């Protein structure tokens, strides 16, 4: 995919249509399946996995998310999240970011936090319904900021907190009642609070 302009984000259970399908496949470790040459994670077949979710809709193709723990034994090309970023261009990063987050919500969030009851399958509005309490749960949204501090032709990078070999732009979560501007000031001040990274 060279351009995501022809695709719009959506969500719904995958149903076979006359449209072509591009499949993304995660295993139970949240690793994504690349092709043999490590050039793409979008496959033009679904590997006979039954349940999937349409996450992008295009004019002639849809992009569908699949997760299957059995497929890991059949393929050697599953790649961990940290290793994928050097393999992705901007357009594929958009697809990967959405797919990875949805994969975590759909396949890793299985039980109601109130009762421990197993959820029903995810619905078309991304909700998961608990039969015990009748409450619909939705993915958590965590507003955050990413700040780039520039001076002439230089950019300020900070050492990644959990992976000292990585450097990154300044990033962190926005606290309740805090504006984006206030969060930027706090993370870029001489004694900033701990960055989320």
Where are these regions (language model features)?
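N-terminal alpha-helical interaction blocks
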Residues: 1-89
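N-terminal strand-loop-strand
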Residues: 26, 127-169, 173
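A gly/proline- and charged-residue-enriched helix-loop-helix capping module
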Residues: 79-102, 109
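Cys/His-rich short segments
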Residues: 101-146
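Hydrophobic alpha-helical positions that pack around
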Residues: 170, 184-189
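Phosphate-binding active sites in nucleotide-utilizing proteins
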Residues: 180
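Conserved small/polar residues in nucleotide/adenosyl-binding loops
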Residues: 187-197
């Amino acid at each position: 995919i060279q351009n995501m302009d022809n695709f719009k984000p959506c969500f719904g259970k995958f149903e076979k249509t006359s449209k072509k399908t591009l499949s993304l496949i995660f295993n139970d470790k949240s690793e994504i399946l690349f092709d043999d040459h490590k050039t793409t994670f979008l496959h033009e077949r679904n590997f006979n996995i039954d349940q999937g979710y349409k996450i992008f809709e295009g004019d002639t193709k849809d992009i569908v998310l699949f997760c299957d723990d059995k497929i890991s034994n059949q393929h050697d090309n599953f790649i961990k999240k940290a290793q994928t970023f050097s393999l992705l261009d901007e357009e594929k990063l958009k697809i990967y970011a959405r797919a990875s987050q949805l994969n975590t919500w759909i396949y890793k969030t299985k039980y109601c936090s109130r009762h421990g009851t197993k959820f029903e399958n995810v619905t078309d509005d991304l909700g998961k319904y608990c039969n015990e309490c009748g409450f619909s749960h939705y993915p958590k949204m965590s507003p955050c900021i990413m700040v780039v501090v520039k001076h002439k032709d230089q950019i300020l990078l900070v050492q990644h907190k959990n992976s000292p070999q990585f450097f990154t732009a300044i990033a962190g979560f926005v606290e309740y009642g805090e504006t984006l501007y206030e969060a930027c000031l706090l993370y870029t001040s001489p004694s900033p609070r701990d960055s989320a990274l």
